[in-house]
Amino acid sequence: MIESNDYEQERLKNIRENERLMKELGVMGGSSTIGGPSSKRTTPTKPKKQATPKKKPDTTPTRIMPSRSSARLAGHEADSETLKRKYEEEAEEARKVAEAAKRARHQPFDLSGMTGGELEEEAIMALESTLQGLANNTSSAAELVDTKDENKRRSANKPDPQFSTERRELEDILNKMTLKSAAKVTPKRIYSMAYHPSTDKDLVFVGDKEGSIGVWDAAPVAFASNRNGVKTADDQDEDAEERFPEGKAWTLQVHARSPVTCIKFDPVNHNSVLSSSYDSTVRKLDLATAKSEEIWAGEEDVLLSIFDVLSPSTHPSVYMDTPNPSLDERSMWIADHRGGLLHIDLRERTRRGNNTRRWQVCEKKIGAMSVNRLAPHCIATASLDQHIRLFDVRALASVVKQTADAPYNYKGVDADDLESAQTKAQFASSKARQACTSVDFSPRGDQLVGVSYDDVVKVWSMEPGSLFSEHGLKNRIATAKSNKPKGAVKKQVPDSASDTGPGLLSWLSRATPLGTKKDVAEAIKQEQDAPSPSLSKRPDDVLANPTRIPHNNQTGKWLTLFRAKWNQNALLEPHFTIGSMSRRAEVYAADGTLLRSLWDENLVTAVPAVTCMHPVLPARLVTGNASGRCTFWSPDP
């Protein structure tokens, strides 16, 4: 206690001594008197004007799963059987909902059913007005092929395409192409695309990963920054992608929640949009009535890869009463994931399941297929077994056994049926080092382009008159003899006709359709009496010596596989388009020359895996990527 008092007295003594010294120095005011830090003087500043935030549509995703909650606060034990059972029931319910969404919808739908009632009345009216009258200014297949000049092109020596007039004209118009509009058309990854043949509108139909078909009117709409037409500071700070024209886009739920693998227009009526999906159905969207209906359905577990429909102006046999699977204009060919080719006659009322004619032509999945326009009995396939094959479907119909039930996998394929198809109906094949993903015939029928996963694009040149198999040729001769009336005298046809196929080009060159039964009978007889091509004139290997184009095709898991597509206007210099891993859309000539590479550093930030061109007008290209975004390129006026 005494020590603490001594300490306190010493402390107080020091305080008094310090105060005395500070009084003598005159600094009793503390640190403020001796120049210590003082508070800063605040000068009034002009208040900063806050930028008015731009109103954006609410894009907050709807939460599907329930909100997280505490099981402890709810009174559940950590290893409660009741809680486990609850979670299992919720998972099972979610699985059933997902499976039901992927299950095919066989009923017809109107516009409100395809939009789910989410579109406003004004948007629906705008869509209906866009779809009306699209087929008024479209061109038929016969108008796109100048067949009288085609014989001269085949017989004459072709000049070097580097110096040809057609090549220079094509390069000139391709070099004028610029990006006109860009927009998000579908909610998910784009799988397929088709350009409407109308010359009045740039209307594109886009299929995505979950059964939606986006309708995009790609015509650019002028951007208005504000009501007065004067850009403000806020407008200048906006991203260029938001200011860029987008056109108009609508989304229709045509199929179930499965990828739309192929979209094509009916060659008879361009107001009908045909589409296939992994839900194993083919549906028709009527643009005039804005209704969708199913036209064919297969087995639920057999996925559809691609299809093609024969054009009525390809041959006169469309007028025959008996459907011919190689020449009927209402014939649809479908390739599936089990290695099968299916033939459908659209005039048949029953078009479901095992009633369809099917042939097992490949061991594994067929990823792509194309029907030759000038030789419709020839079908090219690209499959997972690393082959591109050419088949004569006349031999399929006559000597190859049909396989109504698709095998579950490649182990269930009947070896005898497969060997019969590949030895009797197949007449050419080309093997790649890895899987083949794309194949497409040119509109002139004399060139074929294929894409494979070994980073190469191949282009073959061929004569349509040499695209046949021995058994297919025998079938044609037998059919002609059986259909020929007694006492008929064979017409003398010039030898040059045999070089281009049995009456196909002459049929295409007709300016007027056949109006009477007599004209129809004469046209059919002319095709039947045409001299048959000879096996001795056909090359030993039709798919030999292709033009090889190095191309990175490693799209991986999250991108749609690249597909090379020819421009369908046969009057132009042959050229095709394909996507690129360098985020460019590329245009190639038939000889492998890169004619144009399209890219915009500000607006194209993803790989444009899917491409398509206008079938009539030159240099009009649309691309699509994995986010559902499309770009539209066309020449400057």
UniProtKB/Swiss-Prot annotation:
Q: Where are the WD repeats?
A: 185-226, 255-295, 297-321, 361-401, 431-470, 556-598, 602-637
Q: Where is this region: Disordered?
A: 1-91, 144-168, 482-508, 525-549
- Write down the superkingdom of origin: Eukaryota
DNA-binding as a keyword?
A: yes
**Biological process annotations from GO:** DNA damage response; regulation of DNA damage checkpoint
Q: Which GO terms describe its molecular function?
A: DNA binding
Q: Which InterPro entries match?
A: WD40/YVTN_repeat-like_dom_sf, WD40_repeat_dom_sf, WD40_rpt, WD_repeat_DNA-damage-binding
- Composition bias type Basic and acidic residues, residue spans: 8-23, 74-91
Keywords, alphabetical: DNA damage, DNA-binding, Repeat, WD repeat
The text of the family note is: Belongs to the WD repeat DDB2/WDR76 family.
Q: What's this chain's function?
A: DNA-binding protein that binds to both single- and double-stranded DNA. Binds preferentially to UV-damaged DNA. May be involved in DNA-metabolic processes.
Protein name, as recorded: DNA damage-binding protein CMR1
